[in-house]
Amino acid sequence: MAPRAGQRGLWSPLPGLLLLAAALSRPAAPCPFQCYCFGSPRLMLRCASGAELRQPPRDVPPDARNLTIVGANLTVLRAAAFAGGGEGATDGVRLPLLTALRLTHNNIEVVEDGAFDGLPSLAALDLSHNPLRALGYRAFRGLPALRSLQLNHALARGSPGMLDALDAALAPLAELRLLGLVGNALSRLPLAALRLPRLEQLDARVNALAGLGPDELSALERDGDLPQPRLLLADNPLSCGCTSRPLLAWLHNATERVPDARRLRCASPRVLLDRPLIDLDEARLGCSDGDAHESGEGIDVAGPELEASYVFFGLVLALIGLIFLMVLYLNRRGIQRWMHNLREACRDQMEGYHYRYEQDADPRRAPAPAAPAGSRATSPGSGL
């Protein structure tokens, strides 16, 4: 029945509501296989599928912001691996909004040149805990916005040229702020990392650093308003000889740039084993070779702590001496009487000994010798 004139239609809003419900119930694009999506749009994806995942998922939504892959078997990261690159790929999906990429514990051994092409907004990359054996000289190209790079426990198994490759790969990262190189058995720090203009912190703990040379220390200096980078160097086998003088002088002048300066300890020579480096005096560190250096010959171990203890001991002795003099001064009259009485007693004793000596030495007081037995006594006038 048609509605009467002037009467509002009861079913007129129904088509609009149906259209709205259909729009809201429209199924969203599914998550990549073996991944979990969080947020809408998919701000975060987590893929932890085990060893069967051998390459990054190619159907990652283009609006993804964070991507985490843990526990996979991504042995080789080929060029444009996260933009659909790799073997058999002709056209990959770009991820223009991806800002954080975490790839820890994925058994990654090789990172080829341009492995992260197609990620222009990437700001944080974590490759920690992967047995990297080869790193492309341009592995981190195409990452103009990268600010944090974590390579902790990832380079220890690398080839002898790994440090050179790392130097070349880090050079184009002009916006890098944080660099993690913990537990990589590094014998030196990559100079390219130290020269990054905006670097704020370099974490190089638990490595094989025996010290920092003049070239490394000079690369840490910045001119103008650029930030002065901080270093974390704890748990490195530092050699506390004459070669450590530049590092020790730099530490004394820039302690605030090494937050763990008190944890820097000597590993050699033996005489300085486990001594805090910052407590030593660079002028006292001698240079020796071979066994002499190992035994500590030529190295003066009297550091500020020992000198301070000597000064404190001297002050204590001076205080004790001052107290002793004050006691003597306050009791001077009693001490004088005691000395006088002692002198008189000694005099009386000596006079007694002198009197006895005089008596014993007088011959008239000597007794007459006794007559021998059987002899007859005679008088002086008997004539016999």
From Swiss-Prot:
Residues 361-384 are annotated as: Disordered. Gene3D superfamilies: Ribonuclease Inhibitor (3.80.10.10). Residues 367-384 have a biased composition (Low complexity). SMART domains: LRR_TYP (SM00369), LRRCT (SM00082). Disulfide bonds join 31-37, 35-47, 240-266, 242-287. The chain crosses the membrane at residues 310-330. InterPro entries: Cys-rich_flank_reg_C, Leu-rich_rpt, Leu-rich_rpt_typical-subtyp, LRR_dom_sf, Wnt_signaling_inhibitor. This is Trophoblast glycoprotein-like. It comes from Mus musculus (Mouse). The lineage of its organism: Eukaryota, Metazoa, Chordata, Craniata, Vertebrata.
